[in-house]
From Swiss-Prot:
Forms a cylinder of 14 subunits composed of two heptameric rings stacked back-to-back. Also exists as lower oligomers, including monomeric, dimeric and heptameric forms. The switch between the single-ring (heptameric) and double-ring (tetradecameric) forms is mediated by phosphorylation on Ser-393. Interacts with the co-chaperonin GroES. It comes from Mycobacterium tuberculosis (strain ATCC 25618 / H37Rv). The lineage of its organism: Bacteria, Bacillati, Actinomycetota, Actinomycetes, Mycobacteriales. The gene is groEL1. Disruption phenotype: Not essential. Increased heat sensitivity (at 55 degrees Celsius). Inactivation of the gene does not affect cell wall lipids, or growth and survival in macrophages, but mutant shows slower growth in the mouse lung and spleen in early infection and fails to produce granulomatous inflammation in either mice or guinea pigs. This is associated with reduced cytokine expression in infected animals and macrophages. This is Chaperonin GroEL 1. Its EC number is 5.6.1.7.
Amino acid sequence: MSKLIEYDETARRAMEVGMDKLADTVRVTLGPRGRHVVLAKAFGGPTVTNDGVTVAREIELEDPFEDLGAQLVKSVATKTNDVAGDGTTTATILAQALIKGGLRLVAAGVNPIALGVGIGKAADAVSEALLASATPVSGKTGIAQVATVSSRDEQIGDLVGEAMSKVGHDGVVSVEESSTLGTELEFTEGIGFDKGFLSAYFVTDFDNQQAVLEDALILLHQDKISSLPDLLPLLEKVAGTGKPLLIVAEDVEGEALATLVVNAIRKTLKAVAVKGPYFGDRRKAFLEDLAVVTGGQVVNPDAGMVLREVGLEVLGSARRVVVSKDDTVIVDGGGTAEAVANRAKHLRAEIDKSDSDWDREKLGERLAKLAGGVAVIKVGAATETALKERKESVEDAVAAAKAAVEEGIVPGGGASLIHQARKALTELRASLTGDEVLGVDVFSEALAAPLFWIAANAGLDGSVVVNKVSELPAGHGLNVNTLSYGDLAADGVIDPVKVTRSAVLNASSVARMVLTTETVVVDKPAKAEDHDHHHGHAH
């Protein structure tokens, strides 16, 4: 296929146009008074959302050079979402501000490499300053505050706070759609672990990139599964039940994995394969935990069990299994509450007996997963469109709450980027020379962008608000809900540090990439045929 090539300033400017189109669409969603974006769908009704990454994912531009710029900035939103689960709009706005400020300087003859180095050092300094100023979060109230800020809804905040405080730091909070109008919280037997599907072809929910299995059977296997003749007899028995299958093994590879993928594509058997977490004896022990929760048996060749000879009786079950690319959640496993309680008792006894701190910590993790169960937030709404929007809000709130528990919180509303972050940059600037200093200056200017748009979306003059907040003491800023200035943490306006740090680091990464781009190569678009001259002037 023939290519189009652009160089230097022309290439960077074309990418900037695309980047602006994406960022200008996403930025209207920022803040408690952020606006909605309506997304038309090829099938079904439109989606109404104020979730930045959902908007970003929908955007594809006609001009290939512009689209390249849009896709680069989109990667900032998706990466921030993957790491922190929230903060996608902040990341997009920061990236736009950094790139625009940087491109102005590059056009004026500043060395883009030195500029990029300065931006990188600034991002690291801001990240460290935010971590250093973080306040730890614990307890139902603290978690609920974070979730309320993320979802803009106190009821959602309270539900997430209750869920997280019940299942604990390592526990699992799952979000499901409900057929009722209200949103409610349930606690069930279940377990989660940090391993995802082995092939993207297993995905059933394309919006969330998840494989969702309802009323599933579960095969737990201690070793690798690669031979199709070994797996096929059991697959045929499972197909006869009409139920989906989750396979957890040391690995699933070769023709066994290929067959599962082909079945998934043809929709003949819904099955998902994941690797078991951990290694060696720890993996074996965790598979036994899974067996207790799901009511199944671990197929163990060492104990004389042969995969091709086992029947449905060794399979566990669950009401629902949700698998993403990074983790697996089993909800309402088929094991009895008594068996789970006995297993937890056994783990507690092992913890008491162990002399090793490391062993105790790892056993404690397993106990938390086993005993914590799964909190299920069932989201309901009056219409399909409202349901999707509310479910997105709850998912963001859960992600923000987990991030806050992990690394703590800082004052929200864009204020921590003005106060703590800019203070760190003033100290850094004094230690740099040459064009690297300009990189720090660009970064310092860009840090005001999130606050500017939070204020602008609330109908205020962004520049006036930025100047006012800059003069206030650290931790003070604009509470957009009340349109008043004050102590943000006391007002419950807070952000998880992990979310803000991820936004800063990902924005700086893509900005350095764009600023040092000298040539852009894209596929030449296929020309649409011009039909006009075929149709007559005979009327």
